[in-house]
Amino acid sequence: MELPSGPGPERLFDSHRLPGDCFLLLVLLLYAPVGFCLLVLRLFLGIHVFLVSCALPDSVLRRFVVRTMCAVLGLVARQEDSGLRDHSVRVLISNHVTPFDHNIVNLLTTCSTPLLNSPPSFVCWSRGFMEMNGRGELVESLKRFCASTRLPPTPLLLFPEEEATNGREGLLRFSSWPFSIQDVVQPLTLQVQRPLVSVTVSDASWVSELLWSLFVPFTVYQVRWLRPVHRQLGEANEEFALRVQQLVAKELGQTGTRLTPADKAEHMKRQRHPRLRPQSAQSSFPPSPGPSPDVQLATLAQRVKEVLPHVPLGVIQRDLAKTGCVDLTITNLLEGAVAFMPEDITKGTQSLPTASASKFPSSGPVTPQPTALTFAKSSWARQESLQERKQALYEYARRRFTERRAQEAD
């Protein structure tokens, strides 16, 4: 079974909390005073909810009381097809939308969820996670947990996506390790709805997600139970995971993708450090109609090549494609930001300084060329000589490029 390409990471993860629609933004501004009052009030109520959940033993009464109090906090939990819940199944599989998915499911049925990539701590326990010693022996520990004979049995709630999505477009690729614990799992689907703002943001912390949950009027969590799924004869963990992923995606009306948590991390990295195009790049590339981008790039690369003839043309074009600016590319090449193997310069090319000085006269003194190659005795002297030669070459290249642009302007 092959996964479809599906939507890209920009559609699976929301980068902005506030709505883009002007009307919704206006409504949010008008609601803000009420939201702040609700936030303060719910913070005090939330402390009582936490204390009650810690004081009462795990039972139907505790889940009913805490579920009612959470509804006052604006966290509404609903479920469909609860009759399909098989209490003999020890592994529950769900898609992941918010940092509080496990808390919501725990209001509906008893379950435990391990916290991945985090050491045991008070925060881990207070958030309702099961404390594990480490991920190195995670699978073996969970197998022993499921094999225990304690009554009543506590199932595991696992999120094979390992990272939360916006819950609208598609699912991340399911990891195979949750499907190596037992040969039967029970999937469930989780849909989250919230007015005015996004349900979750890709780079937000769980604290900010909690504050936004208390700020908005309500957040509705809809849980739908599916029938248990058994491993087929000779089916590998990866195939089992893929089959369950497609089943969950079909029930949600979404697409199962090949994207992994690493793709989410790369997407967030690109969002935090976008490639900036300097203003000079806009003047270097004339607006359409005009030459094609390849012709423009070749023209700019030729300009840099005339200033720095010892730099390969391919290196110049690659850096220009990133910067879009002749000045910035020259600076990168002179300062060593771009590695390259210098080309052999012919005699005609070596005489360029003299020719350019007579063809493009300047008011300032001619930049002296590097002296004959000598090897200084001390490392300090060699470093100083290198810096002087680099500065001289840099000043010469800048002057030659400026004179050429002035002549083109005339």
Swiss-Prot record:
Induction: (Microbial infection) By Dengue virus infection (at protein level). GO terms for cellular component: autophagosome; cytoplasmic vesicle; endoplasmic reticulum; endoplasmic reticulum membrane; extracellular exosome; lipid droplet; membrane. Monoubiquitinated and diubiquitinated. InterPro entries: AUP1_CUE, CUE. GO terms for molecular function: ubiquitin binding; ubiquitin conjugating enzyme binding; ubiquitin protein ligase binding. Residues 21-41 dip into the membrane without crossing it. Changing residue 383 to A: Significantly reduced interaction with UBE2G2. Changing residue 58 to I: Does not affect lipid droplet localization. Residues 255-295, 350-369 are annotated as: Disordered. Residues 1-20, 42-410 are cytoplasmic. Changing residue 316 to R: Reduced lipid droplet clustering. The modification N-acetylmethionine is found at residue 1. Changing residue 388 to A: No effect on interaction with UBE2G2. Detected in blood platelets and leukocytes (at protein level). Ubiquitous. Highly expressed in placenta, liver, kidney, skeletal muscle, heart and brain. Residues 296-338 form the CUE domain. Keywords: Acetylation, Cytoplasmic vesicle, Endoplasmic reticulum, Host-virus interaction, Lipid droplet, Membrane, Phosphoprotein, Ubl conjugation. The modification Phosphoserine is found at residues 5, 288, 292, 363. GO terms for biological process: ERAD pathway; lipid droplet formation; lipid droplet organization; lipophagy; protein localization to lipid droplet; response to virus; retrograde protein transport, ER to cytosol. Changing residue 400 to A: Abolishes interaction with UBE2G2. Changing residue 393 to A: Abolishes interaction with UBE2G2. Identified in a complex that contains SEL1L, OS9, FAF2/UBXD8, UBE2J1/UBC6E and AUP1. Interacts with the cytoplasmic tail of ITGA2B, ITGA1, ITGA2, ITGA5, ITGAV and ITGAM. Interacts (via C-terminus) with ubiquitin-conjugating enzyme UBE2G2; the interaction recruits UBE2G2 to lipid droplets. Interacts with ubiquitin ligases AMFR/gp78 and RNF139/TRC8; this promotes interaction of UBE2G2 with AMFR and RNF139. Interacts with apolipoprotein APOB. Plays a role in the translocation of terminally misfolded proteins from the endoplasmic reticulum lumen to the cytoplasm and their degradation by the proteasome. Plays a role in lipid droplet formation. Induces lipid droplet clustering. Recruits ubiquitin-conjugating enzyme UBE2G2 to lipid droplets which facilitates its interaction with ubiquitin ligases AMFR/gp78 and RNF139/TRC8, leading to sterol-induced ubiquitination of HMGCR and its subsequent proteasomal degradation. Also required for the degradation of INSIG1, SREBF1 and SREBF2. Belongs to the AUP1 family. The CUE domain is required for interaction with the ER quality control machinery and misfolded substrates, ubiquitination, lipid clustering and interaction with AMFR but is not required for localization to lipid droplets. This is Lipid droplet-regulating VLDL assembly factor AUP1. It comes from Homo sapiens.
